[in-house]
Each structure stands twice: as structure tokens, then as C-alpha cells.
From Swiss-Prot:
Pathway: Energy metabolism; oxidative phosphorylation. This is Cytochrome c oxidase subunit 4 isoform 1, mitochondrial. The chain crosses the membrane at residues 74-99. Residues 1-73 are mitochondrial matrix. One of its GO terms (biological process) is mitochondrial electron transport, cytochrome c to oxygen. CDD domains: Cyt_c_Oxidase_IV. It is a single-pass membrane protein. The lineage of its organism: Eukaryota, Metazoa, Chordata, Craniata, Vertebrata. The gene is COX4I1. Component of the cytochrome c oxidase (complex IV, CIV), a multisubunit enzyme composed of 14 subunits. The complex is composed of a catalytic core of 3 subunits MT-CO1, MT-CO2 and MT-CO3, encoded in the mitochondrial DNA, and 11 supernumerary subunits COX4I, COX5A, COX5B, COX6A, COX6B, COX6C, COX7A, COX7B, COX7C, COX8 and NDUFA4, which are encoded in the nuclear genome. The modification N6-acetyllysine is found at K4, K28, K35, K42. Residues 100-144 are mitochondrial intermembrane.
Length: 144
């Protein structure tokens, strides 16, 4: 068995909207009926029926512009795949929060934050433009 490789120096058939007339025909090897139709094509086109004209078109082109411009359902696959990976990631995050990460440190408690803020005010941290500049030390409340 001999394997024949493609000759890539020759043009290939491609249906593209930006290149509407490919250099080669879609059907390379014609059947007997297609050869007879190609001979009939050389005569007057008014003698050809609509089906014969469509068959001649299909010998030259695989798809019409309407078929090339037709929308595909590929977006459903893309959205489905994206949702699958987002859901899988959410499951991993939930598993990590439950089994990997420990409890939050005490410094996240509201009471701890309030004590730390009071300590910073007592130390008068950044009194010019920072936290201490917004605290009224005489009234013991935030400036308005």
C-alpha cells in the first residue's frame, strides 16, 4: 500500500467570507454525472434547470454565503465548559475553607478591632493627618 501525501504547493479549498472565490473547486474528482453536467454547462445556461445550476454550484463551492454566515451552537459548549470549571473551582474553595483553613484569628473580632482602635487613639498615632487627627480628645468622640 502506497501512501500519497498532499502536495501543499497547490492551493487548497477553503470556505471563507473574506475570500469568497477559492482558487480550486470543492469537488476535485468528478463522477460521471458531474462530468456530463460540466459538459452541459458549456452550452447556454438558460437550458439548465434550477437543480442543475445548484449542482454546478455545489461542485465549485461547499457552502453558500447564507450557510457560512449561519450561527453555530458552539457558544453553548463554551458557556457550559466555563460554568463547569467555575463550579468545580467553587467546590474546591468550599472544601478548602472547611478542611484546610483554620478559624479566623481573634484580631478579626469586632471587639478586638475596637480595642486596637482605642489603643491607637490613646497613643495618638499619626496626629497630623491620620487617625488621631479625626478624634476629639475633649469630647471623647469622632470629629464631625
Amino acid at each position: 500500500s502506497v501512501v500519497k501525501s498532499e502536495d501543499f504547493s497547490l492551493s487548497a479549498y477553503v470556505d471563507r467570507r473574506d475570500h469568497p472565490l477559492p482558487e480550486v473547486a470543492h469537488v476535485k474528482h468528478l463522477s460521471a454525472s458531474q462530468k456530463a453536467l460540466k459538459e452541459k454547462e458549456k452550452a447556454s445556461w438558460s437550458s439548465l434547470s434550477m437543480d442543475e445550476k445548484v449542482e454546478l454550484y455545489r461542485i465549485k463551492f461547499k457552502e453558500s454565503f447564507a450557510e457560512m454566515n449561519r450561527g453555530s451552537n458552539e457558544w453553548k459548549t463554551v458557556v457550559g465548559g466555563a460554568m463547569f470549571f467555575i463550579g468545580f473551582t467553587a467546590l474546591i474553595i468550599m472544601w478548602q475553607k472547611r478542611h484546610v483553613y483554620g478559624p479566623l484569628p481573634q484580631s478579626f473580632d469586632k471587639e478586638w478591632v475596637a480595642k486596637q482602635t482605642k489603643r491607637m487613639l490613646d497613643m495618638k498615632v499619626n496626629p497630623i493627618q491620620g487617625l488621631a487627627s479625626k478624634w476629639d480628645y475633649e469630647k471623647n468622640e469622632w470629629k464631625k
